């Protein structure tokens, strides 16, 4: 977009007009909480990837140098500005590898194993892409760690049961006395005092973790399809 705008300002036709484009930072935005990124910018992402060495100045200093170069006051600044831009481009190439983490959001994985460990259910899944850097994160009822193409998920059990979350929470009512959600089409006949509109964090039902579930990767994948988006969304 920036180069297209510069071509337009100078009355030139842009060679990029017919090329497909990708807003990399927008694509990676869902990863902010999962990977504990302080900001969705290039320095934060490079820091996550372990890229710490740069030979040229940062963006703020580079802008000041560019203005001095453009005004003719400091022609030697061109080398520094070009060097900074080169490092930015090389860094972007490495940041592209972070797209592999989106496999968790796009259901681009397969369930390999599922077992009960104390009061938790442990899932092991295989992503279709290698993850560039090991990561881990957790919430009150969920823990996740990933390395290479393996991700391990630990979900809290309650009396041998799991919560099954639903993303279309506006179509559900939450029943406090039952600690469960039911479709509004069914709750409409209930006393209004017994129900309230469901929210994202209480739109769930419960199901028992059976031996059949523990040995059925398809059922495990179905569960993760419904619930993993919620668990990922609450990470910070």
Predicted regions: what they are:
Residues 1-236:
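DEDD superfamily 3′-5′ metal-dependent exonuclease/proofreading module
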């Amino acid at each position: 977009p920036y180069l297209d705008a510069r071509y337009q300002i100078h009355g030139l036709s842009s060679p990029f007009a017919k090329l497909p484009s990708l807003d990399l930072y927008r694509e990676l935005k869902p990863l902010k909480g999962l990977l504990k990124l302080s900001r969705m910018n290039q320095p934060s992402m490079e820091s996550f990837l372990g890229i710490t060495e740069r030979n040229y100045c940062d963006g703020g200093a580079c802008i000041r140098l560019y203005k001095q170069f453009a005004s003719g006051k400091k022609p030697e600044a061109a080398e520094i500005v070009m060097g900074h831009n080169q490092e930015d481009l090389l860094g972007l190439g490495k940041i592209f590898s972070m797209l592999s983490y989106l496999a968790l959001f796009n259901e681009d994985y397969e369930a390999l194993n599922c077992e009960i460990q104390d009061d938790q259910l442990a899932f092991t899944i295989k992503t279709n892409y290698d993850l560039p850097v090991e990561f881990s994160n957790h919430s009150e009822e969920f823990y996740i760690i990933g390395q290479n193409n393996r991700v391990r998920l630990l979900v809290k059990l309650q009396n041998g049961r799991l919560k099954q979350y639903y993303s279309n929470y506006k179509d559900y009512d939450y029943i406090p006395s039952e600690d469960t959600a039911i479709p509004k089409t069914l709750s409409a006949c209930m006393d209004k005092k017994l129900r309230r509109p469901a929210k994202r964090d209480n739109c769930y039902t419960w199901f028992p973790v059976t031996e059949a579930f523990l040995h059925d990767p398809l059922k495990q994948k179905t569960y993760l399809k419904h619930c993993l988006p919620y668990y990922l969304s609450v990470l910070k």
